[in-house]
Regions:
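Short edge beta-strands and adjacent turn/loop segments
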Residues: 16-32
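C-terminal structural segments of small proteins and small subunits
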Residues: 41-77
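Aromatic side chains
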Residues: 14, 30-31, 40, 56
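Charged, low-complexity, helix/coiled-coil-prone segments
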Residues: 1-3, 28-30, 67-69
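N-proximal, solvent-exposed amphipathic alpha-helical segments enriched in charged/polar residues
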Residues: 1-18
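Short hydrophobic/aromatic beta-strand micro-patches
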Residues: 34-36
Length: 77
């Protein structure tokens, strides 16, 4: 996935989010994502990370995304 693909996917899953995506190795398969969204309100950190992982479930399954480091924050309205 490209950087733009990652950003689009996150925006689709979290329309209100502030997002930052970093390609950790330059190989487009090791990523770090920062997502701040109101959709995380009332959810545990594990649930927040599961939500982000679901956005990339197929790519993680096939190995297109090999590593995904996730940082989440509950965004205030």
């Amino acid at each position: 996935m490209t950087l733009q693909d990652m950003q689009i996917r996150l925006k689709q899953a979290f329309p209100d989010a502030e997002i930052e995506v970093i390609d950790l190795t330059g190989t487009q398969d090791h990523w770090e994502v920062f997502v701040s969204s109101t959709l995380f309100t009332g959810r545990s950190r594990i649930e927040q990370h599961q939500m982000v992982n679901r956005a990339f479930a197929e790519e993680l399954r096939t190995g297109e995304v090999h590593a995904l480091s996730i940082k989440t924050l509950i965004r205030k309205e």
